[in-house]
């Protein structure tokens, strides 16, 4: 009885599955046909992923073993990148040895390794589902390998309908995907540019006051210029101005400057900054809690203060540099040198500031995106 039931169930099950797969494949072909693409079937023997890669790059699926060895070797050489993604606690060496055997199915790690070792991006087409992209290279000239994925168990190669299949696959461009990618990059670039521009244009009048008090610098224009260079960071601006004054003092050798230094009141330079700075900080906090001042008001205010204070050129410069005004802040060179000095010293200043505050800055990674292993 058991044997009879088993014989009856076989003919019913097989044609039903075959009909369903044929229907899915027909639907899949129609989906790709709308994009101007066609499926190039490869042998389903456990090597299908490597066969599809070989067809895309050489036009010969029989070269599958060459690409299997190439991909496994890349995984072995980049163990620290791939080992954390091996499942079921399988030892790394055992995994690589098994993957190198003929007929072993490829997984997500092999997809990523194939993209990196062939320096190609990969597009995976799925039946009635969005396309998957493994995009490790942003250069528009990078080759795009096109594969189709069937029922979670088989890969085929995908080519343009006009491709004669006489060699490597011809380049395929899916216009909808290209437009989305370009629009996304442009939007990110525009957002970043506008944010940086807005941050640099706005300098709070209270921040200028705090910087001038903390650094004993009476030159409003110089204080504002430094604040712009450090993106409004009050502590960094104060540290820079103090360091700038110290550097100028060390390089001052002429006797004329030495005699002028006798007129400076040392007590004022050492006692008053702390008190003035604390008071100015409190005023700045109150101002920021209320409505913010716009950049035009700040510029008008700074210009008025500069015009009201006309300093004789032969007098000692009020910025505390111990030099005459005409050879310090009163010259175009003195004003323009601030920008260069800021760029040379800001990294060390920001490092000290972070240690003091106990905070960490967000770092924008410039290194290239290596894509996702788990897709």
UniProtKB/Swiss-Prot annotation:
Residues 251-264, 290-305 have a biased composition (Polar residues). Residues 37-161 form the OTU domain. It is an enzyme of class 3 (hydrolase). Hydrolase that can remove conjugated ubiquitin from proteins in vitro and may therefore play an important regulatory role at the level of protein turnover by preventing degradation. Cysteine protease with a preference for 'Lys-63' over 'Lys-48' over 'Met-1' -linked ubiquitin (UB) tetramers as substrates. Also cleaves RUB-GST fusion. Signal peptide: none annotated. InterPro entries: OTU_dom (IPR003323), Papain-like_cys_pep_sf (IPR038765), Peptidase_C85-like (IPR050704), SEC_C_motif (IPR004027). Transmembrane segments: none annotated. Its main location: nucleus. The active site is at residues 45, 48, 154. This is OVARIAN TUMOR DOMAIN-containing deubiquitinating enzyme 7. It comes from the Eukaryota. Residues 1-18 have a biased composition (Basic residues). Its EC number is 3.4.19.12. Keywords: Hydrolase, Nucleus, Protease, Ubl conjugation pathway. Residues 1-23, 251-306 are annotated as: Disordered. Gene3D superfamilies: 3.10.450.50, 3.90.70.80. It catalyses: Thiol-dependent hydrolysis of ester, thioester, amide, peptide and isopeptide bonds formed by the C-terminal Gly of ubiquitin (a 76-residue protein attached to proteins as an intracellular targeting signal). Belongs to the peptidase C85 family. It is found in: Nucleus. The gene is OTU7. GO terms for biological process: proteolysis. Optimum pH is 7. SUPFAM superfamilies: Cysteine proteinases, Sec-C motif.
């Amino acid at each position: 009885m058991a044997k009879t039931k088993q014989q009856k169930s076989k003919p019913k099950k097989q044609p039903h599955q075959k009909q369903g797969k044929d229907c899915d494949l027909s639907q899949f072909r129609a989906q790709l046909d709308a994009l101007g693409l066609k499926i190039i079937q490869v042998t389903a023997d456990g090597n299908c992923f490597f066969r599809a890669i070989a067809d895309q790059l050489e036009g010969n699926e029989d070269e599958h073993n060459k690409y299997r060895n190439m991909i496994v070797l890349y995984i072995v050489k980049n163990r620290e990148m791939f080992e954390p993604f091996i499942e079921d606690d399988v030892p790394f060496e055992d995994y690589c040895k098994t993957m190198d055997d003929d007929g072993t199915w490829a997984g997500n790690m092999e997809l990523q390794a194939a993209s990196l070792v062939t320096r190609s991006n990969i597009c995976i087409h799925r039946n009635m589902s969005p396309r998957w992209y493994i995009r490790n290279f942003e250069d528009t000239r990078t080759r795009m390998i096109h594969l189709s994925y069937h029922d979670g168990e088989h890969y085929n190669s995908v080519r343009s309908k006009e491709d004669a299949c006489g060699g490597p696959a011809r380049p395929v461009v899916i216009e909808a995907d290209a437009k989305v990618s370009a629009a996304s990059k442009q939007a990110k670039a525009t957002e970043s540019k506008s944010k940086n521009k807005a941050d640099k244009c706005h300098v709070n009048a209270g921040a200028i006051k705090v910087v001038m008090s903390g650094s004993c610098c009476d030159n409003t224009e110089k204080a504002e210029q430094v604040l712009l260079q450090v993106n409004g960071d009050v502590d960094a601006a104060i540290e820079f101005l103090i360091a700038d004054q110290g550097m100028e003092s060390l390089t001052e050798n002429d006797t004329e400057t030495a005699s002028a230094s006798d007129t400076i009141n040392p007590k004022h330079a050492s006692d008053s900054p702390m008190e003035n700075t604390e008071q100015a900080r409190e005023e700045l906090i109150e101002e920021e809690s209320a409505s913010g001042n716009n950049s035009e008001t700040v510029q008008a205010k700074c210009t008025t203060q500069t015009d009201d204070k006309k300093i004789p050129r032969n007098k000692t410069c009020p910025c505390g540099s111990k030099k005459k005004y005409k050879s310090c802040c009163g010259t175009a060179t003195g004003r323009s040198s601030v920008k260069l000095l800021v760029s040379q010293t800001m990294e060390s200043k920001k490092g000290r500031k972070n240690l003091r505050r106990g905070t960490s800055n967000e770092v924008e990674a410039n290194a290239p995106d290596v894509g996702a292993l788990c897709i």
